[in-house]
Every structure is written in C-alpha cells, then in structure tokens.
C-alpha cells in the first residue's frame, strides 16, 4: 500500500505542477474585471467538478468578497436542484446549464466550466451558448481537453486524465483564485 500511496502522491504533484500559472493569473484578472464592472460570474460542472464549482462560488462569493470590500456576483448553476430537474425532465439533461444562462447571462458576464474530460454535453452546450451570446468563457479541463477546449476563450489544462487528481487540481486552482483576493485584496482595484 505504501508504494501505491507514494505513486499516487507523485502523480498528484505532477498534476499540480502542470497547472498553467500564467493562465491562472489571467483568470484572476478576469475575475477582478468582473468585480469592477459588476458582472455576473457563472460556474458549472458535473460530479466532483460540480462540487468544486459549489465550493469555489462559496469561497469567492463569501470569503474573497469579505476581504475586497465589494461583492463578487457568482453563482454555481449546478446548485439549484429545482431548475436542474425541471429542465432535465421537460427538455434534456444536456440543457440544464444553457437554459439557466438564457435567463441570467448577459454579454460581458463570465462563464467558467469545470470538466475532467472536457466533453460533458451539458457543459459543452452551456459554454457554446455563452460564447455565441457574448459572455466570456473559460474551460478548466483535464489532459483530454475535449470540445470545451475548442469552444472556450480561455482554457486551463491540467495535464492528467485521472478524475481524482484532476478534480483535486481544479480545487487547488479555485483556491488560488479565491486566496489571491483574500490575501492580496488590492488586486481587486
């Protein structure tokens, strides 16, 4: 077991080392711009990526907002079960994000989607709608990149295909984004 744990630990370090810090820095700038311009930020994903989106929305919306003195307008589209079940029941599961974006998204807003494969149909459809309607789009994906990487304006690739390691690296990126504002609130100006 020790050997397996060491191997997993090495692979996780490699996944974290693959995080493109220049792209993370660019995303910090996009978030700061959204804050200054009072833009809405939408995040969404499935499974573990959905959990990361929820966590990110909480940390940015509460923790980072408390530090910078202005509120980030961020919402995780996978948190409203009533919306998701109504849309998936009446339309299709792949429509759950883009339908919500139709109601709430406006040109200039920011959409960030997390997916290990980059091919989740609901994430692809949400990003595609957002881009076609003037929202800024970001895909945070694993090494397979997928369709999302072809659609998004900005792409952050974690160079691994293992779901656990990519999801852990996603959360590390989300924490970097939040703590950039918590620990250096002047960047919000």
Regions found by a protein language model. Give the residues of each.
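Generic N-terminal amphipathic, Lys/Arg-enriched alpha-helix
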Residues: 1-19
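A short, well-structured juxtamembrane/interface segment
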Residues: 19-37
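Glycine-rich, small/polar surface segments that engage phosphate groups of diverse ligands
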Residues: 34-105
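Glycine-centered short loops/turns at secondary-structure junctions
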Residues: 38, 108, 134-135
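Short glycine/serine/threonine-rich phosphate/pyrophosphate-binding segments
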Residues: 49-54, 119-126, 148
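A charged, well-structured terminal subsegment
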Residues: 103-104, 164-189
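Short, glycine/polar-rich helix-capping loops at beta-to-alpha or helix-loop-helix junctions
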Residues: 140-152
């Amino acid at each position: 077991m020790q050997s397996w744990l060491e191997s997993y630990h090495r692979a996780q370090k490699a996944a974290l080392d693959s995080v493109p810090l220049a792209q993370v820095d660019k995303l910090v700038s996009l978030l700061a711009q959204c804050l200054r311009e009072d833009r809405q930020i939408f995040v969404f994903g499935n499974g573990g990526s959905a959990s990361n989106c929820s966590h990110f929305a909480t940390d940015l919306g509460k923790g980072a907002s408390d530090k910078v003195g202005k509120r980030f307008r961020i919402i995780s589209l996978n948190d409203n079960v009533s919306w998701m079940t109504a849309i998936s029941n009446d339309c299709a599961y792949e429509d759950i994000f883009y339908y919500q974006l139709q109601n709430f998204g406006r040109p200039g807003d920011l959409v960030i989607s997390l997916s290990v494969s980059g091919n989740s149909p609901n994430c692809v459809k949400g990003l595609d709608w957002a881009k076609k309607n003037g929202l800024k789009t970001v895909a945070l994906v694993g090494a397979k990149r997928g369709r999302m990487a072809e659609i998004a304006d900005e792409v952050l690739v974690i160079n691994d295909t293992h779901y656990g390691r990519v999801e852990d690296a996603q959360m590390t990126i989300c924490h970097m984004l939040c703590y950039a504002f918590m620990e250096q609130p002047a960047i919000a100006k």
